Design a protein with these regions (language model features):
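Conserved AMP-binding/adenylation subdomain of ANL enzymes
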Residues: 166-184, 192-232, 245-246
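AMP-binding/adenylate-forming catalytic core of the ANL superfamily
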Residues: 87, 104, 225, 233, ...
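AMP-dependent adenylate-forming
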Residues: 6-29, 58
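Conserved AMP-binding/adenylate-forming
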Residues: 26, 43-90, 396
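ANL superfamily AMP-binding
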Residues: 17-18, 32-57, 87-88, 93, ...
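Gly/Ser/Thr-rich phosphate-binding loop
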Residues: 205, 230-235, 245-307, 320, ...
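Conserved AMP-binding A3 loop
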Residues: 29-31, 143-170
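Conserved pre-ATP/AMP-binding loop-to-beta segment of ANL
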Residues: 16-17, 130-147, 154, 164, ...
């Protein structure tokens, strides 16, 4: 099997009555999901006239319909381009302008985002249906285009093939054999992320039921875990914190849990210990990026001891990682450089960004932008971020984008945006601002000013005012110097 559509067809033949997905009290078998997604795929081709390779943007919270559309688009030979529903209409339009979709599909509450973006828009309820599986999925074709970005803050589409997705799923199944046929996997990460969209496919690839949660509400999440007898889950540390802090967690029945994977944000040893005590199951840390189709390295439960707790693990089956210097020369163990990776889950490239693809993938090795080292046994230890991306609660925030907004304030002379440690979110956004002379700019007024210009997770949670920003002799801003006081005492400064 080389496409996600093939996975669904095969599962529908092998176990047609096995529950494929559960969402808000309703379920579909693999056979039912296969049939319904085929009807949408046929209509997209026959009634809407979409051609192989056309992009279809999706804006909504998690749902069974979202998953159904993933399969339908692949069957029709189309590319799914999920967009973060938390973005403002203005921000969503920037992504749509880059993706150039032939169709935008939204939930009913986000139709205005699609309309504002200027593209042809249908809600899930309005999608046409009817016809047989067009079977236009092709090995090697792009299946998903997830939005990612560099330190410029400009959107880039990471193009992932069906085999990229399935290869990660096979590697993950070896790391977590508890993801099994007939099992129940919690799917609570946003489907517009590789961690959400990927996890739901990887669970179904193994034959598990995807138990989808629309959005993260701690009480609802806890109730779902207990009532649905969840066996496996992918969580971010913020979710683990929410769950372990709920009073009901002290008496909840978590006995069905077999294995929890966590990642996408820094985690404290104290929270990890508390989570292990609460859920009483195996834990694996995952490390990867959108460009690597999610995780390429894992720290298994048996390695959650001693110094290894600071590691993000070793490359999973079939992948290779190394640490290189600025000249791409491999470094010896324990010498810090840039972590690079190669494997079959490496993206096809950035959408319409040939030069940026060439810059990121050199000699077959993807440059992660993360600084770290490897020990003598191949465990990766991350130290800092070469790229300036801030990871807050599993969401990527690009400082240049936030800085551009804040610089639009008439009382801001200069600003720099950095990530600072936070026990709940891993990191939060901090703005360091040089105000114009004679103004009365305050922290509260600047944050409020950004409210309708930035999504909530991008807005600064705090603002420091300074007389000048630190720069070197050539005038380059020294963000490391800005970050240092806030990160003092932290051994690890990156997800």
């Amino acid at each position: 099997m080389r496409t996600i559509a093939e996975v669904l067809r095969w599962r529908a033949r092998r176990h047609p009555s096995l529950q494929a997905v559960w969402f808000e009290g309703k379920s579909q078998s693999f056979a039912e999901l296969n049939e319904s997604s085929s009807q949408i795929a046929a209509a997209l081709v026959d009634k809407l006239g979409l051609e192989p390779g056309d992009r279809v943007a999706i804006i909504d919270k998690n749902s069974a319909a979202y998953l159904e559309l993933f399969f339908a688009l692949d069957k029709a030979g189309l590319v799914a381009a999920p967009i973060n529903w938390r973005l403002t209409p203005h921000e969503a339009k920037l992504i749509v302008d880059d993706v150039k979709p032939k169709l935008i599909v939204t939930g009913s509450e986000f139709k205005a985002h699609g309309v504002a973006a200027g593209g042809p828009t249908l809600t899930f309820a309005d999608l046409p249906r009817g016809g047989d599986d067009p079977m236009r999925d092709v090995d090697g074709a792009v299946t998903w285009q997830f939005c990612t970005s560099g330190t410029t803050g400009l959107p880039k589409g990471a193009m992932l093939t069906g085999w990229n997705v399935l290869n990660t799923g096979l590697c993950l199944a070896m790391q977590m054999p508890e993801i099994r046929e007939g099992g129940r996997a919690l799917c609570c990460m946003p489907l517009f992320h590789i961690g959400g969209g990927g996890w739901v496919i990887w669970a179904m690839q193994a034959g598990s039921t995807a138990v989808i949660v629309r959005e993260i509400v701690p009480d609802v999440l806890l109730k779902t875990i207990v009532e649905q007898r969840i066996e496996t889950a992918l969580l971010v540390p913020a979710m683990m914190l929410f769950l372990t802090e709920l009073p009901a967690s002290r008496t909840a029945d978590f006995s069905a849990f077999k294995h929890i994977a966590y990642g996408t944000a820094p985690i404290s040893p104290a929270l990890l210990r508390r989570s292990i005590e609460t859920f009483k199951c195996r834990f694996s840390q995952l490390y990867g990026l959108t460009e690597t189709t999610g995780p390429f390295a894992a720290l298994g439960h048996e390695h959650h001891v001693g110094e290894r707790l600071l590691s993000c693990g070793r490359p999973m089956f079939g992948g290779r990682a190394r640490v290189v210097d600025s000249g791409d020369r491999e470094l010896p163990p324990r010498e810090v450089g840039e972590v690079v990776y190669r494997g079959e889950n490496l993206m096809a490239g950035y959408w319409e960004r040939e030069q940026e693809t060439a810059d990121a993938i050199r000699g077959g090795w993807f440059h992660t932008g993360d600084a770290g080292y490897m020990d003598e046994e191949g465990f990766i230890f991350l130290k800092d971020r070469i790229k300036d991306v801030i990871v807050t609660g599993g969401e990527n925030v690009y400082p240049a984008e936030v800085e551009a907004v804040l610089m639009g304030h008439p009382e801001v002379l200069e600003c720099a945006v950095i990530g600072v440690p936070d026990s709940r979110w891993g990191e939060t956004v901090k703005a360091v601002v040089v105000p114009r002379a004679g103004t009365g700019l305050s922290e509260a007024s600047l944050i409020e000013w950004s409210r309708d210009k930035l999504a909530g997770f991008k807005r600064p949670r705090s603002v420091d005012f300074v007389e000048a920003l630190p720069r070197n002799a050539s005038g380059k801003l020294l963000k490391r110097t800005l970050r240092e006081p806030y990160w003092a005492g932290y051994a690890r400064r990156v997800n």
